Structures are given as C-alpha cells and as structure tokens.
C-alpha cells in the first residue's frame, strides 16, 4: 500500500474508489494498491 498525495491508475485493471472519504486505488496487482492522505 502506497500513501500518496495524488493517486493515479497505473494499469487498466486499477479502479479508483472512495471509501469513507478516503480515495483508494484497488487492483488485481497488489503493488498497485494506493491510498490518498
């Protein structure tokens, strides 16, 4: 899980979702998981 100021989709599988006001990227590739501060 990377915590970044700006989250971006890295590959076509990545999805940007909002969960309790936190913007996250979920993906089939665990390396692509991101969360916004």
UniProtKB/Swiss-Prot annotation:
Pfam families: Ribosomal_L36. Keywords: Ribonucleoprotein, Ribosomal protein. One of its GO terms (cellular component) is ribonucleoprotein complex. Disulfide bonds: none annotated. The keyword Kinase does not apply. It comes from Leptospira biflexa serovar Patoc (strain Patoc 1 / Ames). This is Large ribosomal subunit protein bL36. Belongs to the bacterial ribosomal protein bL36 family. One of its GO terms (biological process) is translation. One of its GO terms (molecular function) is structural constituent of ribosome. InterPro entries: Ribosomal_bL36, Ribosomal_bL36_sp.
């Amino acid at each position: 899980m990377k915590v970044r100021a700006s989250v971006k989709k890295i590959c076509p599988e990545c999805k940007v979702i909002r969960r309790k006001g936190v913007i996250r990227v979920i993906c089939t590739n665990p390396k692509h998981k991101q969360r916004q501060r």
